[in-house]
Amino acid sequence: MPSSSDTALGGGGGLSWAEKKLEERRKRRRFLSPQQPPLLLPLLQPQLLQPPPPPPPLLFLAAPGTAAAAAAAAAASSSCFSPGPPLEVKRLARGKRRAGGRQKRRRGPRAGQEAEKRRVFSLPQPQQDGGGGASSGGGVTPLVEYEDVSSQSEQGLLLGGASAATAATAAGGTGGSGGSPASSSGTQRRGEGSERRPRRDRRSSSGRSKDRHREHRRRDGQRGGGEASKSRSRHGHGGEERAEAGKSGSSSSSGGRRKSASATSSSSSSRKDRDPKAHRSRTKSSKEPPSAYKEPPKAYREDKTEPKAYRRRQRSLSPLGGRDDSPVSHRASQSLRNRKSPSPAGGGSSPYSRRLARSPSPYSRRRSPSYSRHSSYERGGDVSPSPYSSSSWRRSRSPYSPVIRRSAKSRSRSPYSSRHSRSRSRHRLSRSRSRHSSISPSTLTLKSSLAAELNKNKKARAAEAARAAEAAKAAEAAKAAEAAAKAAKAASTSTPTKGNTETGASASQTNHVKDVKKLKTEHAPSPSSGGTLKNDKAKTKPPLQVTKVDNNLIVDKATKKAVVVGKESKSAATKEEPVSLKEKTKPLTPSIGAKEKEQHVALVTSTLPPLPLPPMLPEDKDADSLRGNISVKAVKKEVEKKLRCLLADLPLPPELPGGDDLSKSPEEKKTATQLHNKRRPKICGPRFGEIKEKDIDWGKRCVDKFDIIGIIGEGTYGQVYKARDKDTGEMVALKKVRLDNEKEGFPITAIREIKILRQLTHQSIINMKEIVTDKEDALDFKKDKGAFYLVFEYMDHDLMGLLESGLVHFNENHIKSFMRQLMEGLDYCHKKNFLHRDIKCSNILLNNRGQIKLADFGLARLYSSEESRPYTNKVITLWYRPPELLLGEERYTPAIDVWSCGCILGELFTKKPIFQANQELAQLELISRICGSPCPAVWPDVIKLPYFNTMKPKKQYRRKLREEFVFIPAAALDLFDYMLALDPSKRCTAEQALQCEFLRDVEPSKMPPPDLPLWQDCHELWSKKRRRQKQMGMTDDVSTVKAPRKDLSLGMDDSRTSTPQSVLPSSQLKPQGNSNAAPVKTGPGQQLNHSELAILLNLLQSKTSVNMADFVQVLNIKVNSETQQQLNKINLPAGILATGEKQTDPSTPQQESSKPLGGIQPSQNMQPKVEPDAAQAAVQSAFAVLLTQLIKAQQSKQKDVLLEERENGSGHEAPLQLRPPPEPATPASGQDDLIQHQDMRLLELTPEPDRPRILPPDQRPPEPPEPPPVTEEDLDYRTENQHVPTTSSSLTDPHAGVKAALLQLLAQHQPQDDPKRESGIDYQAGDTYVPSSDYKDNFGSSSFSSAPYVSNDGLGSASAPPLERRSFMGNSDIQSLDNYSTTSSHSGGPPQPSAFSESFPSSVAGYGDIYLNTGPMLFSGDKDHRFEYSHGPIAVLANSSDPSTGPESTHPLPAKMHNYNYGGSLQETPGGHGLMHGQTWTSPAQGPGYSQGYRGHISTSAGRGRGRGLPY
């Protein structure tokens, strides 16, 4: 019967697959469609009810029929035996047993169950059938019927016929171990391919038998719940044996074997093998069926419920009986049969191979995919490779969706656990379960491209393994048969031939590895693998599966060692194997690669040496098989053999916690299981030695290794953070690379940056230390869309932040050092053929040691001069973009970077970007005005550029660069001119720049660093926030503080007191030098009477925190709603209030002293300015009044108070007081310097104390935690003149701090009050900084507003103040400030400058400076001040030289000139002051600082004020 059915179904051993398929399809059509319905229902029922006995009669009944009838009958009988037979019938009909097997797997657990039942029953059947071919053949039909409806529907009857036959042959390894004549590898491949076809075929056929299948599934699901589990246990044993046999058959890949062997040697060998097996199986059927039913249910139940179930199943492989004897013997007989059949028939035991091949071939096929083994073992061997499992999953899911089980076990790993649970449920419910399980991994695998590739590799590997197995089968077949016989006899465990074993092992090992992973996850809960193994033994099915794997391993062992030790050793191996497989699989699965194998080997080896027991060999084999699946199977087999030997030495892996890093102790496994559940999916992590590399597999370090301190920047693909390395305590910058919104994975800019920075190693180029992630696990990373972090060395500042802050003044030597380092780094890049393409001030980093580093290589690219390919011209920030890019050049050269560096050189001198436009056309226009219009006369190739005709300037300009930047030192100007050549071919190179006179002999290492703000890291982001806050009219305390550095005290205080005074801050910065003029201001106008002053003091003292709005109310100051809101946000800290009295008083004393000094008040007012900008205007007015009276009343107190406040660190006042130490050289200059000092102190002290008084620290943007220490330079520059006046004032008044703030406000307010209001309007219009009209009016409006640069409003409106200024000498200063802000203002002032510095004491100068500062305070950076740089009158410089002498007295006017602008040009021309005003582009606060410096009297403040505010 079997042979006839096989022949009929298979079309004869010699028939080609296509022919066999056709025949099988025809037969199926004829017999399956009519017979299947009755057979399926009755077969299923009998199978469930009478597992062993009914099948034989049915088989016999099936046998008598014609080949087709026999096939149908066999299907019926086998179906009676188990759900499997129908599949076998299909296989016979299709002649595609492998495909059938795969289809069965796909079809679901039922298919597997049926196969198992067939196996279990076919064991007895062999004798009954004699060949068992009929049973296997018959089994095909039920398989079709039992297959999921989806699978059936998918497989048409036609497709189902051929592919089902193929599947039947494949699945029913017994029914013609080779469904096709093709070699096992070919069969397996076909099986895989055919399995897919069969899926469709079966789907179509199942479409016909959908109802039947559904009914059968339902019945199976119900009965199969119990019986199916029994049959599964049988299947688990017999099925696994079949699977092994199928593996052997498929691996032997002798289709003839399956067919002819099934017919001939099948009957003989199968009878021989089956006889022992039959007796055993009969015993099992009578005894085992119940136990199988009992045990399989347990295994299934336990497996379903617990991971242990898998282990139990594995164990139950050996336990299959108490069935160890019967199952083991069964297995042994099966393995012997498999081995025998392979050797005799060359195809393996045909009947057994059919049975074994049927279930085994499905298994092997399923396993061949690499998921199959594990899944098949755990799921009764039905688990098919991922491909199959996917189809079976779907099918079984739709009818019997074992989703519940799947979900239950999916926990371990959705794919693996689901496989197990699904395979179990599907064993019961449908054959597809094995496929199901495979599918779950495959689906999971397929979810990622990596998984898909791995899946492909698995299939290819399985095919290769099958081929290798086939090749080895012939040689090993005999050995395997003998070894199998010996092993079967000795161990009474069925082991497939080594070829089969290895083919199946390799294929199923992959599956097994995955299954093992599942098992690990599931088993992990059990503390000891041994216990788990015992449980597995208790569960027959898993043991069967495990036994298969073990048998495969054992077969290899047998081949190597001849025979494994006994059933005990086998069972031990099985137990160990599942455990080690589980353990190893976890790591192996992740590391399904050579590393895994090596690691496993190493781990196992390390563990093995102490463990001499050979039983471990199966595990090793499995591990090896897994590894083999991964690597070349021949190599894998050898490795596996070696591992096996090592494993044989190893005792139970569970007991050996150290045995495997990969396979840890059960408890460790549990943890590992959980960890591995996460780690297994680690797609990104190293796949090898997952456990071994636990700590390093996902990356040695995670972002958790850093303490993130704050954000310091925003890049193109994420934020930049300042962080501290927890291990080394080193400061680093973390550049975040977010993958969230990245459509194409990792950002190309980040890839380029990483790639390029790894090739650039230079002291002037930022160093990338490492790359870390924000996830410790690849699974989490994939799930949550993690981020990468590029770890760079930390740099304290960038040039943009420093220039805009106004806190630093760079002299010519500093600029030389910076440019030397910059050009060295750029020359290095260009010599390495890299273009940076994004050089700008914010990408030039600076640390506190004065080291310059080029950063942000996200736009950089490799450059090839020989290469003519075009590059994008949309590179380089617009302000630094060279004319060739603006005109559309795409074949540019490194000259583009040199242009950017030339822009930076000019910016270092002018303190502001030299070409500021917001559109390309406007940018080109600006360049043309300074550098001349691009024309063929100067730039012959310009006519070739794409946009030359469309973008050329409307009018022709001549080159005026040297005239515009005449204030730059000659050597620097030469280089500047050379670097800004329009024609890129005439532009200097980085190397030539290093050889120019300006940079030739510069040694940056020997040059002292500039006086950098150690209390504040000045970065672009900080600077932008600061500027934004000022524009919003809010006090940017931090910014103010920094600005104060530029502004020194005034800028800081202004910002703090009322950012609205943003103008004031600028003026404050200047006023530091000009603060002398401020006192007069305070006088005018709003002076608080004693009662008002008392109220103010009481207010300050009485409240723990004072709201600026309250201040305004108390002072009866009118404020607009916007300013009011800003003021409401501003609270003075209790500390400030505590010193509030002092502050208020000191302010008054300061004001008083300032008034006498004439320059102190402005500085003091400036200091109050540090308060919120919005509040500043209002507060300034209020303070102006308060300070006026306070100053009058308490000049002497002021000095004391200021000193006290300095000590107390109370706000603006204290810093001012600190400044006092340097006493004014002259009342005017002294006051001016003192004011500057006070401003400095305010900046330094104010950051903490003053600001708190004026603004709560929380409201201030980043500020130095402590007030910046007073720098001698700054103090001297700003305070020399101011020293004495401020000191005495502040010392005298206990409220000096408050008074200083008030004085500053008053100084601004009063001067602003008279002219202020005029100017205030302008200021308000021009600048958002001005919250209060007073402040705005004062000077702020014009100087702060961008207008200052552009408009004379500040000065014009200040023109009224200039009167005051003149009286204070502030007029000249104002003009100088105005020069910064506007040329017109200078015009008024230039005559006065001399008078200003001379006739007007520092106070006047200070006031003027305040005005000037206010101007610079304007964010000139917001405007294009390039063309206004000539505004500044030289007179201001000259004037300022006197007053500025205080601050700059230390630095002669020349030094001032060195202050970049005015050093050369401020004195020389108003342009210098204009430049100084331009400085304000950086920020109002900055402007003031520089403005003071730029003012002649305060060179430091002027330098700072001009920093960027310098017009040019």
From Swiss-Prot:
Residues 706-999 form the Protein kinase domain. GO terms for cellular component: cyclin/CDK positive transcription elongation factor complex; nuclear cyclin-dependent protein kinase holoenzyme complex; nuclear speck; nucleus. Residues 92-109, 210-220, 419-436 have a biased composition (Basic residues). It comes from the Eukaryota. InterPro entries: CDK, Kinase-like_dom_sf, Prot_kinase_dom, Protein_kinase_ATP_BS, Ser/Thr_kinase_AS. Residues 160-171, 246-269, 350-374, 384-402, 463-491 have a biased composition (Low complexity). The modification N6-acetyllysine is found at K557. Residues 129-140 have a biased composition (Gly residues). The active site is at D838 (proton acceptor). It is an enzyme of class 2 (transferase). Residues 1-60, 75-547, 567-597, 655-677, 1026-1085, 1139-1173, 1201-1231, 1245-1273, 1309-1334, 1353-1400, 1483-1512 are annotated as: Disordered. Interacts with CCNK, CCNL1 and CCNL2. Interacts with C1QBP. Cyclin-dependent kinase which displays CTD kinase activity and is required for RNA splicing. Has CTD kinase activity by hyperphosphorylating the C-terminal heptapeptide repeat domain (CTD) of the largest RNA polymerase II subunit RPB1, thereby acting as a key regulator of transcription elongation. Required for RNA splicing, probably by phosphorylating SRSF1/SF2. Required during hematopoiesis. This is Cyclin-dependent kinase 13. It comes from Bos taurus. The lineage of its organism: Eukaryota, Metazoa, Chordata, Craniata, Vertebrata.
